């Protein structure tokens, strides 16, 4: 509609208001229509150049124009209205027509003014369009000028640069030519000197020829004499002999002279030939270089020609563009002239038409005012014309300037062409100089060929000199054969000696192989630097040396044979060289023999060292166990999953058989090598040896059963429990024979006994039994218990009954007679058996100690009711309040079954415990590691759940009182804790340092000593006996403890969920207490389960987030995404901190051990691992709590109830810590006592179970790797589902795309990390990737999760022997490195080294270095340990017990002997270290060199890659710019097409409107005629009252006619279409809404207005108002009709009085007046309609003209668009060509520069080569 309005504004205006009054207009107005056609013709001429689809008017312009037009229309209507009223008031009757005509003339004047204003506006628009075109043309010209200037300047710069370069090149060429001329002169001088030398040589050759001729003559004389003397043989034999003797010395002398001369001549000829050849090569190189220079210069000239042509073409294109611009400017000038002529014509025509009119109306003053206004308007137009003409002049000046600039450009072009011609001339000069150089080179070639010919002639003259050599060669060959035979004899003797030595070595090696076969296998697979590996290495070295010697001997024999065969062909020099080789070989043989003897001595020394070392059992057992671990750990570890059950059973049986064989071999070697009597075993230990040999098979079968079960069900905790129970029952049946549960302390009674402090004589039997047990366990007499399983069963049952009775609160006097008898029998048996095995004074341990322990325990149990209550409540909450998916169903079921068993069947539980003596023994034998608090709480939970549930209701009712009491208790407990910590800190540090030094592990940090988790792990890691913590009992307890730990762990996490955020600080304390509560065998499994549970927690958290319904609000979604992002950032920070922490721990280890990169991440201190696990899991908890709070916020009731629970939990934790500190006091004294007695029990029999423990550890490792792989698979699946859910959530709601993308990237990164972890667990080796942050995250995850299966071995199987601990570490390192080499510290420091050379070499080097360093560290640590222990024993003699003082002397002597032995071992190891370190330094240097080379190649490749990538990016940018430009052009074309379609639609709609308005006007004309007739009849009615009946009859007929016409018009109105009515209503909204606003269509802007039209058109508001007026008039007329009928009726005249007739007359007159006013209003409303001609198929000439003009304008616009696109394409092509030209020119210049530099360098090198002392100058960049 906007464009429609614009077109309406452009259409001409005709008469407004007078069309209805004057049906016939004067013929003079025809001229106006013509002028209006001219006015219409102005529009396309203006818009032909300027109107474009992009240059459209704004809505504001349209609105302003509409408002102005409305105001003018309103003012005009008001003026007309008031004028008409004034005229009616002043004049009446005949003068009315004059005033009407006057008003019409004024209206015409106003319309003419408006037309003038419109034309002025059109002129202004045209002038603006011309100005914009001129400006655009000027800007384009300026831009073209600037581009041309830039191009010209660039070309000038390039040409000047090229000229300067060519001048420099010419200068350089001249300098080179001068140097070449100087070189030729020197060569000429050299040639002359050589020619003189040649002439001298020729003279010498002539003398030699004379000598040869003389010799030939002598030979002829001798032959003649021989012929003459043959006839006289008998007579003259003596003379012949003398003559022959005389002739032979002459020949010898002459032959010697000839030889000397020939040798000198030969040397001179060779020198001459070499010099000539050098000269020839030099000239050829120079010729080639000059030819290359010629070619390059020709190429440069060709490229310059091409560039000049291109620039010429570009200049031609610019000139063409300028010409086109000039044409456009000319066209604009012509159009401006046309516009001016049209404007002048437009001014003249209305003046011509108005002159006769004004002549008619000279009498009126208004006409004069109108004329004055017209004159003023003409003056304005004249001034505007003047300004237009000045603008035209300015445009012409601009055109002149453009032509001048074109001329300048042409001049510059000519100048550039001249410069190009000059450059061509210079190129021709250079070509001439090159031609001259070629001629000189050809001359030099000819001279060289002549010299070559002379030399060839000289060589041909010397063919027969080699004949004289044969005589001398024969003599030399004879002498050599003699010497060769002597050397053969010597070689045979040496070979015999070597064979004897080899046989002796073979005998020695066969003997040693039988003894140390297993050690050889270990060295081959583990790559450890042990003495056995040195032996094999020396053997291989000797064999290789002997093979080399035999090869040398064979080579010597072949040389001699070759000499014997080719006596005649070889020369003297070759024979001499061969003699030298023989002498060198002889020397080498002697050196090899000496080296062999030295090696033999070294071998013997090593054998003696090995025999002495075999007396140490620890290293031997470590070798055995490491060999077993290698046998068990195959390369394809995870192929076991694909095996069937039968194959697994076969494999297991094979492994068991192999273990049995190895065990028997080891026993045989022990019996043969070691002397058992020297070690001093007890008889019971020997029995254990034999028993353990018999029980290997049974143990291995049970282990395989457990291994198969683990493989089949890796994730089911219930089946683990059942299997562990079955295994324990099997072990109970077999008895505790394997020595896993020996050495119990008196602290066993600290939690298994139940004697009250008030007990009296009734329990003497039990007291005796307890005293016996205390002495028994303190004296380490468990072999007796091992041989008596029935005793252990009875003891276990009795102790459990005691515990149950004590827990249920029953007194001790309710014992049955059976139990008393059983106690008596056990006491008697123990006394008898202890009397045999121990002396009497060993029972002197005081009973008070035991009693005090019982008392302490009972005091503790009294205080711990609250602890039990709390633990039970925690676990019930864990059962009831677990969220969905938080814990597996199997674990919940297992826990529920445990609770039911604990509540309803305590007797069955006690029986099961009684039937498991192995587990009981393990639990009882670790007072220092298993906290009694943990077991007491576990037993109380199982046995006292009914009582505790009853006691739950006995708490005080008011929470405030409870809170106050709990806070007071907490403060008291904290004070006590501080006191205990200050007391025990020193003891802890001393104990941990001593144990770390004894076990050969790195000392943990002082910061770690204070951490309770680290203390617990260090305590569990160093115990008395290796057998105490091994075996299936420990694994079973680990399985049970794992379930218990996981349940406790989940309960703690639930508490942390329920706690308010203020109490989150309690979480680390809870974790520390929980780790202290665990047993030693379950710490590793706890760590593993903890990491797994942390993973599960996060998984389940995400599950919960998925299960929550998708929120409708996008803000909530964004908030949750933000929270999840913060969580992810927190996890990343945790991983980075863990990585830093692991690096710090590695650095601490290297500082402590004095090595750099020797130990990898596996040798971390346990405290570090525990800290990492604790921080990781606790932070998981905190994050999970946050996540849960985000997903479902807590209610206020829960927050109120949580304060009391948190205080209770704090109290429980403080009490537990206090109890733990009290227990630690007791445990420290027991541990110090055990450490002092440790070396008494060192016997090889204890380490027989190491084979089984290694196998068990390997099976556990594999199982845990499988478990972790399964967890990774589950977590990856979960991540994929989470990504899908996230995508669905994004589709369902509107989220910020940036936030969603970031979250999606993080999720995909997590999924990628999980896939890499899964591959790592499955294949053992991860593909190499470039180092970026994703790989650092993967390393962090590996260090946290992947190292768990290897770290848990040490707390599960700690040993006192340092060497064996080291071997275990090495084995774990070996297994870990074979799977994943990345966590190694060496590979972390040098990742490139690991990628550039093979892994096997690295493994060997690292293992050798580590073993050597570890041996040294071991010896140093043992020395330090023994020294500190001696000092401690000296300082603690008064405080120690009687056993310590009794065993001090024996310990001192054994320690001194061990110290001496270790010092010797240290010296030997230091020597070995020095040797190894030198070799490794050399190898590392070589490796570094190769690394440096490869790094350089990598850098080059990276640089190339960056350059290629930059080029690609640049090309992509260009493509994107071009695409964008194309899109803009297509958008412009589309917009223009849309505008065209819109214009066409508007034209159609206006045609329809016209047709409908014509019909309306016809109906209105008919109605107006009727009203005119009525108006004529009104005065007649007033004048003639007698003619009323006739008038009434006529009026009645008129009314009938109007009533008949009204429905007709009403029926014609609905002919309007819907769209047209809408458009009309839209146009007339303003007039309908406001009472003062007039219709929207402006007077003078009437659609389809024409004086010859047969229709009337107007607004629907005007029509409605007119219709109302007519209807009102009809009602008035009806009333008047009634009144007249009443007045004229005879009845009224008869009946009515005289006064009554006056009333209807007054009414009639008032109604007449109102009718008059109604008619006046109707007449005013009729003036608003105008006369139109509806466009039909035959009558739409004007509209068709307009449509044709629009089409022509559209075609012109299309053409202009096409031309502009062409211009743009041409300019783009020109720009591309210029860029390409610049590139080509720059490349050519670079090439020429390089070529000239090379030429200069070659020319400078040539004269320098002739002088021997001169050094060739090197130019930079050449």
UniProtKB/Swiss-Prot annotation:
The modification Phosphoserine is found at residues 485, 544, 1243, 1245, 1497, 1592, 1595, 1822. Residues 1022-1046, 1350-1391 are annotated as: Disordered. The keyword Cytoplasm applies. Residues 1372-1389 have a biased composition (Basic and acidic residues). GO terms for cellular component: cell junction; centrosome; ciliary basal body; cytosol; gamma-tubulin ring complex; Golgi apparatus; microtubule; microtubule plus-end. Residues 1688-1822 are annotated as: Interaction with PCNT. Potential regulator of CDK5 activity via its interaction with CDK5R1. Negative regulator of centriole disengagement (licensing) which maintains centriole engagement and cohesion. Involved in regulation of mitotic spindle orientation. Plays a role in the spindle checkpoint activation by acting as a transcriptional regulator of both BUBR1 and MAD2 promoter. Together with EB1/MAPRE1, may promote microtubule polymerization, bundle formation, growth and dynamics at the plus ends. Regulates centrosomal maturation by recruitment of the gamma-tubulin ring complex (gTuRC) onto centrosomes. This is CDK5 regulatory subunit-associated protein 2. It comes from Mus musculus (Mouse). The lineage of its organism: Eukaryota, Metazoa, Chordata, Craniata, Vertebrata.
């Amino acid at each position: 509609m906007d464009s429609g309005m614009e077109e309406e504004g452009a259409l001409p205006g005709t008469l407004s208001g007078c069309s209805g009054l004057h049906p016939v207009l004067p013929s003079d107005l025809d001229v106006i229509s013509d002028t209006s056609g001219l006015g219409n013709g102005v529009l396309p001429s203006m818009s032909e150049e300027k109107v474009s689809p992009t240059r459209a008017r704004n809505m504001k312009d349209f609105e302003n124009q509409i408002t102005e037009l409305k105001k003018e229309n309103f003012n005009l209507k008001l003026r007309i209205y008031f004028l008409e009223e004034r005229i009616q008031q002043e004049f009446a009757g005949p003068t009315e027509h004059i005033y009407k005509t006057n008003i019409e003339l004024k209206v015409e004047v106003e319309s003419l003014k408006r037309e003038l204003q419109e034309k002025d506006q059109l002129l202004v628009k045209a002038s603006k369009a011309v100005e914009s075109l001129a400006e655009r043309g000027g800007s384009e010209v300026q831009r073209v000028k600037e581009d041309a200037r830039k191009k010209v300047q660039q070309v000038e710069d390039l040409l000047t640069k090229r000229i300067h370069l060519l001048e420099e090149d010419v200068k350089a060429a001249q300098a080179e030519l001068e140097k070449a001329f100087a070189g030729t002169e020197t060569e000429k001088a050299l040639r002359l000197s050589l020619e003189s030398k040649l002439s001298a040589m020729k003279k010498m050759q002539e003398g030699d020829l004379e000598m040869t001729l003389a010799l030939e003559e002598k030979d002829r004389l001798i032959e003649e004499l021989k012929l003459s003397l043959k006839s006289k043989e008998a007579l003259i034999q003596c003379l012949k002999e003398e003559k022959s003797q005389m002739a032979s010395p002459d020949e010898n002398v002459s032959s010697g002279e000839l030889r000397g001369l020939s040798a000198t001549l030969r040397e001179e000829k060779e020198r001459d030939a070499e010099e000539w050849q050098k000269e020839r090569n030099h000239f050829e190189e120079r010729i080639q270089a000059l030819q290359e220079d010629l070619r390059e210069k020709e190429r440069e000239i060709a490229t310059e020609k091409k560039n000049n042509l291109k620039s010429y073409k570009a200049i031609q294109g610019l000139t063409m563009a300028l010409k086109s611009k000039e044409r456009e400017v000319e066209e604009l000038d012509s159009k401006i002239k046309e516009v001016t002529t049209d404007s002048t014509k437009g001014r003249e025509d209305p003046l011509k038409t108005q002159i006769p009119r004004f002549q008619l109306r000279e009498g009126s003053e208004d006409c004069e005012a109108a004329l004055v206004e017209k004159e003023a308007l003409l003056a304005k137009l004249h001034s505007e014309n003047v300004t237009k003409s000045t603008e035209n002049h300015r445009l012409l000046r601009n055109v002149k300037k453009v032509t001048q600039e074109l001329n300048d450009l042409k001049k510059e072009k000519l100048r550039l062409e001249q410069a190009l011609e000059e450059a061509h001339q210079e190129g021709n000069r250079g070509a001439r100089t090159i031609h001259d150089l070629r001629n000189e080179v050809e001359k030099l070639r000819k001279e060289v060929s002549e010299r070559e010919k002379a030399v060839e002639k000289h060589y041909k003259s010397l063919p027969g000199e080699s004949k004289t050599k044969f005589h001398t060669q024969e003599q030399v060959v004879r002498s050599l054969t003699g010497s060769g035979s002597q050397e053969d004899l010597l070689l045979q003797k040496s070979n015999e000696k070597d064979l004897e030595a080899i046989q002796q070595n073979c005998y020695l090696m066969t003997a040693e192989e039988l003894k140390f076969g297993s050690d050889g296998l270990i060295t081959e697979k583990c790559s450890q630097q042990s003495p056995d590996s040195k032996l094999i290495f020396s053997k291989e070295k000797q064999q290789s040396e002997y093979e080399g010697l035999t090869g040398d001997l064979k080579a010597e024999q072949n040389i001699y044979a070759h000499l014997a065969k080719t006596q005649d062909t070889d020369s003297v020099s070759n024979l001499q060289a061969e003699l030298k080789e023989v002498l060198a070989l002889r020397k080498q043989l002697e050196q090899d023999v000496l080296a062999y003897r030295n090696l033999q001595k070294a071998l013997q020394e090593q054998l003696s060292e090995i025999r002495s070392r075999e007396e140490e059992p620890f290293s031997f057992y470590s070798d055995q166990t490491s060999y077993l671990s290698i046998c068990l750990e195959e390369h394809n570890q995870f192929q076991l999953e694909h095996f069937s059950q039968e194959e697994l059973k076969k494999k297991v049986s094979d492994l068991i058989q192999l273990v049995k064989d190895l065990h028997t071999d080891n026993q045989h070697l022990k019996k043969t090598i070691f002397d058992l009597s020297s070690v001093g075993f007890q008889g019971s230990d020997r029995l254990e040896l034999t028993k353990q040999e018999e029980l290997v098979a049974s143990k291995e079968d049970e282990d395989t059963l457990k291994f198969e079960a683990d493989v089949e069900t890796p994730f089911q905790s219930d089946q683990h429990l059942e299997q562990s129970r079955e295994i324990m029952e099997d072990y109970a049946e077999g008895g505790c024979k394997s020595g896993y549960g020996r050495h119990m302390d008196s602290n066993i009674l600290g939690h298994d006994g139940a004697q009250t402090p008030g007990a009296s004589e009734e329990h003497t039997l039990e007291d005796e039994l307890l005293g016996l047990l205390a002495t028994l366990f303190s004296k380490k007499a468990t072999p007796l218990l091992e041989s008596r399983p029935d005793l252990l069963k009875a003891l276990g049952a009795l102790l459990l009954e005691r515990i149950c009775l004590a827990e249920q609160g029953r007194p001790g006097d309710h014992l049955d007679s059976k139990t008393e008898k059983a106690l008596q029998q056990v006491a008697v048996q123990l006394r008898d058996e202890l009397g045999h095995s121990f002396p009497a004074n060993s029972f002197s341990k005081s009973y008070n100690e035991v009693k005090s322990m019982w008392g302490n325990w009972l005091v503790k149990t009294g205080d711990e009711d609250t602890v039990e209550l709390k633990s039970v409540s925690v676990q019930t909450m864990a059962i009831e309040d677990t969220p969905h998916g938080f814990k597996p169903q199997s674990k919940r079921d297992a826990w529920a079954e445990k609770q039911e068993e604990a509540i309803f069947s305590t007797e069955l539980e006690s029986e099961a415990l009684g039937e498991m003596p192995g587990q009981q023994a393990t639990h009882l034998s670790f007072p220092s590691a298993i906290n009694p608090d943990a077991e007491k709480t576990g037993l109380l939970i199982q046995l006292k759940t009914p009582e505790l549930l009853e006691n739950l209701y006995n708490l005080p009712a008011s929470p405030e009182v409870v809170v106050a009491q709990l806070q007071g208790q907490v403060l008291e407990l904290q004070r006590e804790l501080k006191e205990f910590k200050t007391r025990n800190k020193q003891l802890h540090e001393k104990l941990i340092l001593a144990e770390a030094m004894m076990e050969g592990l790195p000392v943990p940090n002082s910061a770690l000593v204070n951490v309770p988790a680290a203390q617990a792990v260090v305590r569990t890691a160093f115990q008395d006996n290796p057998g105490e913590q091994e075996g299936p009992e420990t694994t079973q307890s680990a399985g049970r403890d794992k379930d218990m730990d996981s349940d406790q762990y989940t309960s703690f996490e639930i508490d942390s969920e329920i706690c308010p955020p203020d109490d989150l600080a309690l979480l680390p304390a809870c974790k520390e207490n929980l780790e202290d509560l665990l047993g030693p065998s379950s710490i590793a499994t706890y760590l593993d389960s903890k990491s797994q549970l942390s993973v599960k927690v996060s998984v389940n958290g995400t599950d919960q987030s998925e299960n929550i319904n998708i929120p409708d609000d996008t803000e909530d979604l964004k908030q949750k995404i933000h929270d999840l992002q913060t969580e992810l950032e927190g996890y990343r920070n945790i991983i980075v901190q863990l990585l830093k922490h692991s690096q710090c721990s590695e650095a601490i280890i290297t500082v402590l051990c004095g090595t750099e990169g020797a130990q990898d991440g596996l040798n971390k201190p346990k405290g570090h691992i525990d800290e990492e696990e604790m921080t990781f899991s606790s932070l998981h908890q905190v994050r999970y709590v946050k996540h849960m709070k985000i997903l479902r916020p807590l209610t206020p009731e829960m927050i109120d109830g949580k304060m009391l629970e948190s205080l209770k939990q704090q109290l429980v934790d403080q009490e537990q810590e206090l109890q733990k500190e009290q227990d630690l006091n007791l445990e420290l004294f027991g541990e110090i006592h055990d450490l002092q007695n440790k070396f008494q029990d060192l016997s090889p029999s204890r380490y027989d179970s190491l084979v089984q423990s290694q196998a068990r550890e390997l099976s556990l490792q594999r199982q845990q790797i499988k478990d972790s792989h399964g967890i990774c698979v589950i977590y990856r699946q979960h991540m994929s589902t989470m990504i899908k859910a996230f995508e669905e959530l994004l589709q369902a709601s509107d989220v910020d795309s940036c936030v969603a993308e970031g979250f999606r990237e993080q999720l995909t990164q997590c999924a990628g990390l999980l896939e890499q972890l899964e591959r790592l667990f499955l294949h053992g080796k991860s593909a190499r990737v470039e180092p970026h942050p994703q790989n650092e995250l993967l390393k962090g995850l590996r260090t946290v999760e992947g190292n768990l299966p290897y770290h848990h071995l040490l707390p599960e199987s700690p040993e006192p022997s340092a060497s064996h601990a080291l071997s275990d570490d090495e084995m774990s390192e070996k297994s870990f490195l074979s799977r994943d080499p990345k966590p190694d510290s060496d590979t972390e420091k040098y990742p490139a080294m690991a990628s550039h050379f093979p892994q096997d070499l690295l493994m060997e080097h690292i293992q050798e270095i580590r073993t050597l360093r570890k041996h040294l560290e071991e010896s140093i640590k043992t020395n330090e340990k023994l020294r500190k222990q001696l000092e401690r024993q000296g300082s603690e003699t008064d405080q120690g017990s009687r056993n310590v003082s009794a065993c001090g002397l024996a310990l001192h002597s054994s320690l001194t002997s061990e110290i001496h032995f270790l010092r010797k071992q240290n010296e030997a190891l230091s020597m070995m270290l020095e040797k190894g370190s030198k070799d490794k330094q050399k190898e590392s240097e070589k490796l570094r060199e190769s690394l440096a080379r490869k790094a350089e190649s990598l850098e080059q490749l990276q640089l190339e890659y960056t350059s290629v990538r930059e080029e690609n990016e640049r090309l992509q940018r260009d493509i994107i710019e071009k695409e964008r430009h194309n899109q803009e052009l297509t958008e412009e074309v589309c917009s223009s097409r849309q505008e065209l379609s819109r214009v066409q639609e508007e034209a159609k709609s206006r045609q329809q409107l016209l047709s409908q308005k014509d019909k309306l006007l016809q109906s209105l004309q008919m109605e107006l005629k009727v009203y005119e007739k009525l108006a004529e009849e009104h005065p007649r009615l007033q004048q003639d009252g007698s003619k009323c009946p006739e008038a009434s009859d006529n009026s009645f007929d008129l009314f009938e006619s109007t009533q008949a016409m009204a429905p007709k018009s009403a029926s014609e109105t609905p002919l309007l279409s819907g769209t047209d009515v809408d458009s009309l209503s839209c146009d007339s909204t303003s007039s309908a809404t406001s009472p003062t606003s007039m219709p929207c269509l402006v007077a003078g802007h009437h659609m389809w207005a024409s004086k010859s039209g047969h229709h009337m058109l107007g607004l629907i508001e005007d029509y409605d108002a007119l219709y109302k007026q007519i209807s009102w008039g009809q009602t008035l007329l009806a009333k008047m009709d009634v009144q007249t009928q009443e007045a004229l009726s005879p009845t009224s005249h008869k009946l009515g009085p005289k006064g009554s007739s006056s009333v209807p007359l007054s009414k009639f007159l008032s109604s007449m007046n109102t009718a008059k006013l109604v008619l006046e209003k109707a007449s005013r409303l009729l003036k608003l309609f105008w006369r139109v001609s509806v466009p039909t198929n035959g009558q739409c000439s004007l509209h068709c003209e307009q449509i044709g003009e629009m089409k022509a304008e559209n075609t012109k616009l299309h053409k202009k668009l096409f031309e502009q696109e062409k211009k743009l394409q041409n300019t783009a092509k020109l720009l591309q060509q210029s860029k390409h030209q610049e590139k080509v020119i720059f490349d050519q210049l670079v090439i020429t520069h390089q070529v000239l530099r090379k030429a200069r360098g070659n020319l400078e090198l040539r004269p320098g080569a002739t002088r021997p002392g001169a050094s060739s100058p090197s130019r930079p960049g050449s």
